[in-house]
C-alpha cells in the first residue's frame, strides 16, 4: 500500500510539473511580442551599444538614463531598469547587484549581443530587428487570417501594392529595409568567405538582388581579380555607395541578367513563386559565360519536420514570405534541384552551410 501511494504521488508530481511547464509555455506564446518590442526599444535608445562601452563593468539604468538626454532622468532610469530586467531574464543581458548602499543593478552584454551590437565592420542584426518590428512590417500580420479565408497576400491587403513596389513609394521604409539587408549580408558573408571556396578562379560575378552592394564589396575585397556587378532595382541601388571594383547596375532580373562567369543569388529565390524562380534561373542560365555557375544562398526546409534551429529559422522565414510576398516561400533542397533542372541546368549540388543558410551551386 505504501509503495502504491508513493508511486501515485510521483505520478501526480510529474503531472503537475508537466502542467506547470505547459502553462508557462502557453503564457510565453500569448505574450510573445513583448520581448522583441523591448529589444526594439533598447536598440532605438542605443542602450546595448552604451552598455558595451562600459566593458566588463557594464552600466546601471541611471548611468544609461544620463546618456540619452531624457527629460526626466530619474523616471527614465526606473523604466530602463524594468526593461533591462526583462532582457536579463531572457539571457540577452547579464545582471549583478552593486554592494550597499546603492544596491543598484548593473547590466552587461550576454553572448547573443555579439550579433546585436556593431562588430569591427560596423555591422549587427540590430537593423534587422528594427525592420521586423517596424510598423510597416507589422501591419500585414493583422491581415493574415483574412487572406487565409478569403485569399490574397497580407502585405498587399494592407498597402494595396506588392512589397517591392511599396519600397519605391516609402523612402523611409526602403532605407530601413536596405540597412537591415546590408548589415545581415556583412555578417553572413564574413562567415561564408571563410568556408566557401567557390569564388576562387571566378573572373566576373553578378550579385543579383544585391541591394546596396555589401556582398559584392566583400567578395572583391577577398578576390580582387573578380570584376563584380551589383544588380538590383533602380530605387535600391540609389542608396549604394561607390566602390572602384563594383559596378552598380539597375534593372529587372525577370527581363535579363548581366553576363558573367558566376551569378550569385543570396536570399532572392525565397521572395518569389516557383514560376518566377524558373524564369529567373533561366535568365541566369542564359547569362552564364562558358562553364560558369549560379551560386544560391538560401535557408532550406527539411524533408522531415523537426525542431532544430535550422528548421525553426527556415519555417519562420517561410511564414514571413507567406505574409509579405505573393508566392514567396522557403524550399527543400529537392525543390531547389527541381527548379534548377527545369531552368536547364544539369545539376545542383549543396556545397556548405552557415548561419542557417545553405550554399548550393547550379551547373550547366
UniProtKB/Swiss-Prot annotation:
Q: Which family does it belong to?
A: Belongs to the class I-like SAM-binding methyltransferase superfamily. Cation-independent O-methyltransferase family.
Pathway listed for it is: Flavonoid metabolism
Q: Where is the active site?
A: 270
Whose protein is this, by species?
Mentha piperita (Peppermint)
What is annotated about its quaternary structure and interactions?
A: Homodimer.
**Which one GO biological process term can you cite for this protein?**
methylation
The alphabetical list of record keywords is:
Methyltransferase, S-adenosyl-L-methionine, Transferase
Q: Tell me the enzyme class.
A: transferase
What's the EC number here?
Answer: 2.1.1.42, 2.1.1.-
Q: Which reaction does it catalyse?
A: quercetin + S-adenosyl-L-methionine = isorhamnetin + S-adenosyl-L-homocysteine + H(+); luteolin + S-adenosyl-L-methionine = chrysoeriol + S-adenosyl-L-homocysteine + H(+); a 3'-hydroxyflavone + S-adenosyl-L-methionine = a 3'-methoxyflavone + S-adenosyl-L-homocysteine + H(+); rhamnetin + S-adenosyl-L-methionine = rhamnacene + S-adenosyl-L-homocysteine + H(+)
- Specify one Pfam family: Methyltransf_2
Superkingdom of source = Eukaryota
Where S-adenosyl-L-methionine binds, per the record, is at: 232
Designated name of the protein: Flavonoid 3'-O-methyltransferase 3
What InterPro entries does its record include? COMT-like, O_MeTrfase_dom, Plant_O-MeTrfase_dimerisation, SAM-dependent_MTases_sf, WH-like_DNA-bd_sf, WH_DNA-bd_sf
Function of the protein: Flavonoid 3'-O-methyltransferase involved in the biosynthesis of polymethoxylated flavonoids natural products such as pebrellin, aroma compounds which contribute to the flavor of peppermint, and exhibit pharmacological activities such as anti-allergic, anti-oxidant, antibacterial, anti-proliferative, and anti-inflammatory effects.
Q: Give this protein's Gene Ontology molecular function annotations.
A: O-methyltransferase activity; protein dimerization activity
Could you tell me which PANTHER family the record lists for this protein?
Answer: O-METHYLTRANSFERASE (PTHR11746)
